[in-house]
């Protein structure tokens, strides 16, 4: 019974998190992963903005999942990233957590990515919170 209640609670929390997220403002155009120092991985992510205005501050995560929908992990978009309308932005994580070593082993076609934007401040001062 306790497991059932825990599963329901986790499902509700996950649903709330997904509801507070915009998956349309930024898109992953590409990514790469290379071995770094001891048990670390350097991950580079290329993002493209579909926002209607230039972005000044952003709160967002890039999620990586495998072809069977298993979680690989998530990496933050730099909070103070200045991203022009229709522009691109590259995020380099020089020391991604150890579990990102899966990106070194998996085929690119077996990795799914998406960006979840939680909040954004545009250059004109307007805010959107999702």
Put a short name on every predicted segment:
Residues 1-7:
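Sec-dependent signal peptide recognition
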Residues 14-16:
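N-terminal signal peptide c-region/cleavage motif recognized by signal peptidases
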Residues 18-46, 50:
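Low-complexity, acidic Ser/Thr/Pro/Gly-rich terminal tails and inter-domain linkers that flank the onset
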Residues 42, 57-61, 112, 117:
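Exposed beta-strand and adjacent loop surfaces of beta-rich binding modules
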Residues 45-49, 64, 95, 120:
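Hydrophobic beta-strand positions in extracellular immunoglobulin-like domains
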Residues 52-70:
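Short acidic, flexible loop segments centered on an aromatic residue
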Residues 72-105:
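Intrinsically disordered, low-complexity Pro/Gly/Ser/Thr-rich segments with frequent PxxP/GP/PP motifs
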Residues 92-130:
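Terminal connector regions
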């Amino acid at each position: 019974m306790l497991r059932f209640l825990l599963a329901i609670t986790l499902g509700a929390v996950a649903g709330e998190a997904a509801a507070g997220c915009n998956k349309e403002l930024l898109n992953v155009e590409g990514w790469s992963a290379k071995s770094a120092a001891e048990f670390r991985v350097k991950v580079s992510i290329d993002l493209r903005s579909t926002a209607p205005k230039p972005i000044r501050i952003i709160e967002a995560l890039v999620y990586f999942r495998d072809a069977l929908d298993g979680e690989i992990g998530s990496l933050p978009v730099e909070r103070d990233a200045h991203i022009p309308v229709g522009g691109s932005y590259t995020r380099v994580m020089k020391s991604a957590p150890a579990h990102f070593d899966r990106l070194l082993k998996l085929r690119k076609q077996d990795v799914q990515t998406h960006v979840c934007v939680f909040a954004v401040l545009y250059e004109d001062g307007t805010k959107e919170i999702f």
